[in-house]
Amino acid sequence: FGPRIMNSTAHDSCAEYLINKFRDYGLKVTEQDAMLDGYDGTPLKVKNIIASINPDSPKRILICAHWDSRPWADNDPQESNHKKPVMAANDGASGIAVMLEIARLSSVDSCFISKIKFGIDFICFDAEDWGTPQWEEEDNPDSWALGSQYWANHPHRSGYTANFGILLDMVGGKGARFYREGFSDYYASGIVDKVWSVANSIGYGNYFINSRGGTVTDDHKPINEILHIPTIDIVPYYPDCQSSSFGPTWHTTYDTMDNIDKDVLSAVGATLLEVIKNIKDE
């Protein structure tokens, strides 16, 4: 599709693809449309996509990621690229890929996930990455995560809640390691403990580092603060990367498939499946 930027044909085409994929896997899909203002007042045509397994089950968990692309590669090492769009293979597609694979497995009779009794809501948040670009003098923190802010204030179901939530952001980059994110520890340390323990128990402790990383304004923040659903962020932390603690391709023209590591994606996906399996067995 190319960059999935709001108000573009690529954005519309990608939304249609995601909706059809989730429906093909037998999930109930709800579309949430809104017109929201970007950091500079640009009207943005926003679409959150909610895909549900066992939609009528009262016990639910939430798994989410953003699907939009950043319009500007404002952290690119070449200043001439700063106003070019980001392909967003990692920062915009990797978390969605993990969710789609879990949804696919839910349609396979031989997989345990097809037999779970609780509900899972996969939410593809839009407009996460239209935040203030670096060339502006002041950053407005409320200009980020617009889709999740809107959903948290207007849930797709009245009175919606979930036992807990897991946000996936940039979960496919080369060299990615996932440290305990600050807001996650503040609002949902028990969920962080559970997920990191599961990762370690199945051999992925080298990816999930049980130490504090950064504190990230991300889609989990409004979910915690507005809906009070304890939600964590699986997000990479590169302590030795000079260009960004999110890694060398963050908000650059290098966020492409060439820089995706399937082993990182597998570690995150396998950990999530094991977390879900443990809920089933509780």
Indicate where each model-derived feature is located:
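Second-shell loop/turn segments in exported
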Residues: 1-9, 36-40, 81-93, 111, ...
